[in-house]
């Protein structure tokens, strides 16, 4: 089976600043390995992370009129109507490749024609780890001061709405595949999510309150589970699934 690895370093805001509340897009150096081939570029790593998350469930084929996987820039965040997804418009330069789903595998096609096949599970691990590293950098910096402009504000809101939804879905699927417990934090409390089978029994345990909730299936878990006094499904965009334990 093939190899896919992706890492980012030298993370910074515009002008190589360590912090900038006005810059919404994170930049840095990205190295991505496909088998024995390594591609490197400096680009907008926040856009890279979101499009990696998109490819957990969707194909992305290289196209001249589409953003690259490592775009040199990401000028505009274009939100959909209900602010659940965003498209990023950037420069016409960057590093790109195609990501194609084939059952339980992912096939990558590079501009050179080289192809690499990896398991979807391994791909999820890499994508979620990359996204987590980018999100941690955002969280360690000053909160963003989004301008009053509705277009920009909606784009930024939609960016994080889509990010959190896709990250959570990816982590939950990985947990189902591996049978391992998930950790999440919300409003300063720490929770642990575990399950027995795909649709058998889900449980939510709060470390601080020692409260244990049990639900017969994933759908019921999302519809009925409570975080504090709010339903899990109503808080999904704000939940931070931290890791698989």
Stretches with model-predicted labels:
Residues 41-69, 197-234:
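Acidic, aromatic-enriched beta-alpha/helix-loop junctions
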Residues 102-167:
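Mixed-charge, glycine-accented linear interaction segment located at domain edges/termini
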Residues 1-49:
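N-terminal "first-domain core" detector
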Residues 27-35, 88, 98, 106-109, ...:
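Short polybasic amphipathic segments
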Residues 33-35, 82, 89-94, 185-189:
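Short strand-coil-strand connectors
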Residues 38-77, 165-185:
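Negatively charged, low-complexity tracts enriched in Asp/Glu with abundant Ser/Thr
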Residues 23, 31, 79, 96-101, ...:
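Short, exposed beta-strand/loop patches in secreted or surface proteins that constitute
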Residues 66-119:
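An exposed acidic His-Trp-rich patch
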């Amino acid at each position: 089976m093939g190899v896919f690895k992706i890492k980012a370093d030298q993370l910074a805001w515009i002008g190589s600043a360590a912090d900038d509340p006005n810059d919404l897009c994170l930049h840095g150096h990205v190295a991505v390995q496909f088998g024995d081939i390594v591609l490197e570029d400096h680009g907008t790593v926040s856009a890279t992370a979101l499009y990696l998350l998109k490819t957990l469930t969707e194909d992305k084929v290289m196209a001249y009129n589409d953003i690259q996987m490592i775009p040199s820039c990401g000028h505009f965040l274009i939100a959909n109507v209900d602010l659940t997804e965003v498209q990023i418009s950037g420069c016409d330069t960057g590093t790109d490749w195609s990501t194609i789903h084939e059952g339980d595998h992912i096939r990558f096609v590079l501009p050179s024609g080289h192809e690499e096949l990896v398991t979807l599970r391994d791909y999820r691990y890499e994508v979620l780890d990359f996204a987590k590293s980018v999100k941690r950098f955002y969280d360690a910096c000053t909160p963003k001061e989004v301008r009053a402009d509705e277009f920009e504000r909606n784009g930024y809101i939609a960016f994080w709405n889509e990010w959190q939804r896709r990250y959570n879905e990816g982590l939950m699927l990985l947990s189902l595949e591996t049978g391992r417990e998930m950790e999440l934090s919300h409003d300063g409390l720490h929770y642990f999510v575990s399950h027995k089978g795909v649709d058998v029994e889900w449980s939510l345990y709060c470390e601080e309150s020692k409260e244990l909730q049990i639900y017969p299936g994933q759908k019921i878990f999302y519809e009925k589970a409570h975080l504090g006094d709010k339903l899990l499904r109503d808080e999904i965009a704000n939940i931070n699934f931290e890791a698989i334990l």
